[in-house]
Each structure stands twice: as C-alpha cells, then as structure tokens.
Amino acid sequence: MTQRKIIHIDCDCFYAAIEMRDEPELAGKPLAVGGSAERRGVIATCNYEARAYGVRSAMSSRHALKLCPDLTIVKPRMEAYKEASREIHSIFRDYTDLIEPLSLDEAFLDVSDTHHFSGSATRIAQDIRRRVSNQLHITVSAGVAPNKFLAKIASDWKKPNGLFVITPDQVEDFVASLPVTKLHGVGKVTADKLGRLGIVDCADLRSRSKLALVREFGSFGERLWSLAHGIDDRPVQNDSRRQSVSVENTYDTDLPDLAACLEKLPALLETLGTRMERMEGQYRPGKPFVKVKFHDFTQTTLEQSGAGRDLGSYEQLLTQAFARGGKPVRLLGIGVRLHDLRDAHEQLELFST
C-alpha cells in the first residue's frame, strides 16, 4: 500500500485573526469574538493575548470580562469569516481535490498523489502557509503525517503559526509517549477509566492486547489499540458536491486600474480551463462570474446567465464589476457555476432498474 501523505491545516484564532486584520488597532490587545455580556453572550474564540488571562472559547462573556477587564468583545461577522474560508480553500485546491473541511478554519488534505514540489507534503504545507499569510494576512498551523489522527495532533504541536512533521519512521516513537488524552475520541470519562487501569500514555496501551481492550471498552477498545500503534485508516472524506469552480489570485502590488485588471484575465482563464477539465463528465458548466476585491477589502461578485465563458465575456463582466468600486484591486477571481451531472445519472439508474 502506498504511504499516505496527510496535511491538517488549522487557522490560528481564526475569527479573532480576521477582526485584527480588518481593524489593525485591535492587534496586540486582548480580543474576543462573541456575544455581549449584557445579553448572556458566550465567547466564540479569542486571540492569544486574551488566552493569557484564561479566556477560552465557550466561556460566558461576563466571566471572560472578570478574568480580563480590558477585553474587547466584538460581534461575529460570519460572512467575512466564510469569505476568508473560501479563499483558503481556493488555495487548497491548487494542490489537491481531496479536501475534508472540518469547519470554516480547519481541514484535512490528502496530497498522496500530488506532483507539486515533487510530491513533498512538507513543502506543500510550507507553501500553503506562505500563501495564506501573504494573501489573507492571517496565520495557519499545519501538521503533516501518514494519517489523519497524527496530522491533527501535529498541527497543534507548534501552534500558533507553526509546522510539525511526523514521518513514517517517527510514528512508533512519537505515539508511544503520547498521553491517552490526545487520542481521538478519548474524553474525560474514558481517560479516567484508563487511568484507573494504570494506562496514562500509548506505551501503556500497547502493553494491553486488543482483546483485553475490547473487553474493557467494547468496540472502542479496538480503536484504542489501533491509535496506540499509530494506525488510522480513515480516508479524507471529499463527498461534497461543488457549486462552482473558480480561480483567484491576490497580487503583491495592487492593480491600479481596469486596464491592469484586464491584463491578468488570460492567465486566470487558462488556469480555470485546466480545473474544469479535471471535472469533465461530472458537472455541466453554467453562469460565468467574476470576483473583485478592492484594496480596502470591500468586494463584489458579478455573474450573468446566458453569457459565454470566453475571454470577451469575462472582460465584460470584469469591466462592470470594477465600475462598482473604481479603486485599486488586490484580488481578482473568475469562475463558473456548476450543475451536478451525477444527480441526473443517479436518477437515470434509478428509473432504468
């Protein structure tokens, strides 16, 4: 069996990072995103300055303010977070289509079969971190390992803004010293039961047979045995049906005018064509669209039914979209809405039986 290469990407205090990016005066101060204390709100996330005071996610805002009286609490802006998440996933898709989102700010990537960087998962993770930093001005932590269980642990190993790699030959020694509380699925109740049995780390777990663990923990005992040996065969689940295919680029220097934007279209269109070829037979292309993000982070998206997907059509859309802001542009994107042909195929199979 080919050795898998799994990357786990986790944004660092994601919501708070977006707020500090968009409101630079918040940076360096204790900050939380959540509901107001007056309305019994809770903390969704907070930056590391706030965590130094003991502020944590899911804590009541009132309690958080007692721990940190200087804490600034801002309301969540979900659309801003979703947009940032979409930009990050657009970066992911430059390396692999095997992406399993866990939330807006966290995902697994299977890069086992990619040819980027000669197949080096470590270099891919480094490049993703670089691009997210340059394009979105936030940081992500990454873990690289032969499976999902270890990749997720690795991404947390050097947080924030870190990269940790567990190579196949390091798995046995690395896992042996792991506390059982690090194992996927082990909560307080299971950890307490393991502790009563004298099991505090994976080396202790390895001393027990699979049968003994199954007797104590039922079917989960088999899972415990596998994790203690660094085994996790769960695939990266990529079952979502795509609604569009797109390509976008954030430019190191803002594009000053419409002419500069139009010059970038041919390269974007070529990349879009390559991505569409990979999905041939799965989707029917629909409306073309363009996305423009201006230098002040305001943005607009414009699509048109019945328009072509040639360079001229995208030039017309871009011209109209640019006119909505008329300011220097930091990001350009183009794409196509998709209609899933697999649903139609499944219906045909259903009625042909």
Swiss-Prot record:
InterPro entries: DNA/RNA_pol_sf, DNA_pol_Y-fam_lit_finger_sf, DNA_pol_Y-fam_little_finger, DNA_polymerase-Y, DNApol_IV, PolY_HhH_motif, Rev_trsase/Diguanyl_cyclase, UmuC. It catalyses: DNA(n) + a 2'-deoxyribonucleoside 5'-triphosphate = DNA(n+1) + diphosphate. Disulfide bonds: none annotated. GO terms for cellular component: cytosol. One of its GO terms (biological process) is SOS response. One of its GO terms (molecular function) is DNA-directed DNA polymerase activity. It comes from the Bacteria. The keyword Flavoprotein does not apply. Residues 6-187 form the UmuC domain. Keywords: Cytoplasm, DNA damage, DNA repair, DNA replication, DNA-binding, DNA-directed DNA polymerase, Magnesium, Metal-binding, Mutator protein, Nucleotidyltransferase, Transferase. The active site is at residue 106. Its EC number is 2.7.7.7. Belongs to the DNA polymerase type-Y family. This is DNA polymerase IV. The gene is dinB.
